[in-house]
């Protein structure tokens, strides 16, 4: 034997230890549960994982809050844009209808003169008035209505103003929805209140009673008067 063989026979071979670090057991196919202390640095990775999980939760909450703010801002912007569009459409519609009020005045005068009782002009007037009514145009200002300074413009006034009502309508007013396009030109008079009627009746009754109870003139007085 050589010297090398002698050394090999004198020293027993070192045992090799193989650690199976596979998480799944190849024989059973189940996942192995290794305690944290059995693996080097097992506690530190868990702490790091917990910290990273908390940071991720905070980040998700922050992003969720940002998303909610963006959604609220967009909803407010959408409402504001729709409101502005509607206001612009209402202004444009009011401008067009306002240009046609003079035509309605001419048609009203023609109606009072009996020119719209029949014929093609009546058909045109009916179609125009129907179209404007469909857009929301309404007329106001009729005799007997209470005077409203918001809707009516008084050009003449009779009375002390205690109970003003419309006595004469010079020009009708028009509203488009809730917007006043033109005030009605009216003449205002005062109505007599019920109390005033009662006082007037009470004043007339004693006068009539006195006339009934007055004694007739005698014939002597009548003859003296004749002489």
Curated annotation (Swiss-Prot):
User: Which GO biological-process labels does this protein carry?
Assistant: protein folding
Polar residues: compositionally biased ranges: 1-18
Fetch the PROSITE patterns from UniProt: GRPE
Which ranges are annotated Basic and acidic residues under compositional bias?
19-35
Keyword terms: Chaperone, Cytoplasm, Stress response
Q: Where is this region: Disordered?
A: 1-57, 193-227
Question: What would be an example GO MF term here?
Answer: protein homodimerization activity
Q: Name one GO cellular component term.
A: cytoplasm
- Main location per UniProt? cytoplasm
**Where would you find this protein in the cell?**
Cytoplasm
Which HAMAP family does the record match to this protein?
GrpE
Annotated function: Participates actively in the response to hyperosmotic and heat shock by preventing the aggregation of stress-denatured proteins, in association with DnaK and GrpE. It is the nucleotide exchange factor for DnaK and may function as a thermosensor. Unfolded proteins bind initially to DnaJ; upon interaction with the DnaJ-bound protein, DnaK hydrolyzes its bound ATP, resulting in the formation of a stable complex. GrpE releases ADP from DnaK; ATP binding to DnaK triggers the release of the substrate protein, thus completing the reaction cycle.
Per UniProt, subunit arrangement is: Homodimer.
What's the protein name? Protein GrpE
The organism named in the record is Mycolicibacterium paratuberculosis (strain ATCC BAA-968 / K-10) (Mycobacterium paratuberculosis)
Q: What is the lineage of its organism?
A: Bacteria, Bacillati, Actinomycetota, Actinomycetes, Mycobacteriales
């Amino acid at each position: 034997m050589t010297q090398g063989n002698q050394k090999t026979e004198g020293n027993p071979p070192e045992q090799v230890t193989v650690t199976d670090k596979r998480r799944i057991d190849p024989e059973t196919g189940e996942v192995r549960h290794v305690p944290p202390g059995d693996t080097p640095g097992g506690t530190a990775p868990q702490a790091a994982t917990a910290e990273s999980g908390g940071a991720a939760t905070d980040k998700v909450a922050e992003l969720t809050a940002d998303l909610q703010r963006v959604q609220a801002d967009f909803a407010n912007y959408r409402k504001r844009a729709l409101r502005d569009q509607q206001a612009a459409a209402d202004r444009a519609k009011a401008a067009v209808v306002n240009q046609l009020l003079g035509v309605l005045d001419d048609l009203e005068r023609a109606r009072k003169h009996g020119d719209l009782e029949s014929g093609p002009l009546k058909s045109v007037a009916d179609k125009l008035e129907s179209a404007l009514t469909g857009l929301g145009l309404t007329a106001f200002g009729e005799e007997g209505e209470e005077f409203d300074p918001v809707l009516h413009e008084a050009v003449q006034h009779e009375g002390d103003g205690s109970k003003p009502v419309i006595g004469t309508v010079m020009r009708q007013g028009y509203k488009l929805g809730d917007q006043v396009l033109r005030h009605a030109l009216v003449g205002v008079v005062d109505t007599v209140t019920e109390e005033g009627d009662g006082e007037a009746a009470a004043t007339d009754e004693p006068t009539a009673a006195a006339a009934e109870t007055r004694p007739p003139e005698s014939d002597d007085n009548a003859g003296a008067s004749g002489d």
